[in-house]
From Swiss-Prot:
Pfam families from the UniProt entry: Kunitz_BPTI
Species name: Naja nivea
Highest taxon listed in the record's lineage: Eukaryota
Entries under CDD domains matching the protein: Kunitz_textilinin-like (cd22594)
Tissues where this protein is expressed: Expressed by the venom gland.
Protein name per the record: Kunitz-type serine protease inhibitor 2
GO cellular component terms listed in the entry, alphabetical order: extracellular space
Keywords: Disulfide bond, Protease inhibitor, Secreted, Serine protease inhibitor
Alphabetized GO MF terms: serine-type endopeptidase inhibitor activity
Length: 57
């Protein structure tokens, strides 16, 4: 799994409300969060399937 999968979810600095998914290391699964639209980190996916393919395996 890529190292960025270990990063915490970051909503970013903007105020949009974009449904996104991130890999939660403690829970060992992909979870939904709301992304603000700018900033953040690479542990952010448009779909839960994309998150699973990248971070779960």
């Amino acid at each position: 799994r890529p190292r960025f999968c270990e990063l915490p979810a970051e909503t970013g600095l903007c105020k949009a409300r974009i449904r996104s998914f991130h890999y939660n290391r403690a829970a060992q699964q992909c979870l939904e969060f709301i992304y603000g639209g700018c900033g953040g980190n690479a542990n952010r996916f448009k779909t839960i399937d994309e998150c699973h393919r990248t971070c779960v395996g």
